[in-house]
Amino acid sequence: MGIIKTKGIILSESNMNDFDKMLTMLTPNGKIGCAAKGARKPKSLLMAGTQLFVFGEYMLYQGTSSYHINSCDTIELFYPIRTDLDKLKYAAHVTKVINDVTDENQNTYRILQLFLNTLYMISETDKDLDFILSVFKLRLLCLLGFTPQIKACTNCKTGENITHFSIRDNGFKCEACSKIDKGAIRISDSTKTAMQYIVLADPKKIFSFQISEENLQELNLVSNLYFNEKLEKEYKVENLF
């Protein structure tokens, strides 16, 4: 079997035998299972690069049922996540979501890019963790094919007097049309602008905006409800201990 060189990030790790690990890694070309022989030995050259959240470059060879890691070079450890329980909790939540929505043999370059940018924001900045999570969820939905209508009312197509977001109809509603959609959520102009920015911004700049605490509550509500509805699962940030 040939050697494969790829960049990837560790989504999960489990112990195997006395010193080995079984890993799930997200690469630009999908999710793969990897065995890391001897990675738990104290002096193993694989130890640093086979931990949860680590982004690295890996040399792999394909076995009968999984890939095996020959060598690895770490690119980013996201160390602050490991020393802050709140950061760890949110990073674990984001990682679970990514694990759920990705599969083998698919183009996951843009999802990997979003995942790395999100972990960087959690790890290296002091931005509100709920803000980071809301931006991540809304942008991820766009990558999964659930881009909301954020230019005009989903019903009458007007761009004027947008006052609500409709989970049912996947986008904005004007004041008049919102009256026939009891589930539509009222949003401010600032929240509307924030959502438009998240959907349309350059991938490297999606977190580069300010929002008030009141409007962040609206953004959190909309992104969480919309996310859970489209993925047909209720995601919550869980306590780790």
Q: What kind of region is each of these model predictions?
A:
Residues 1-241:
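Non-catalytic alpha-helical scaffolds and adjoining flexible linkers that form interface surfaces
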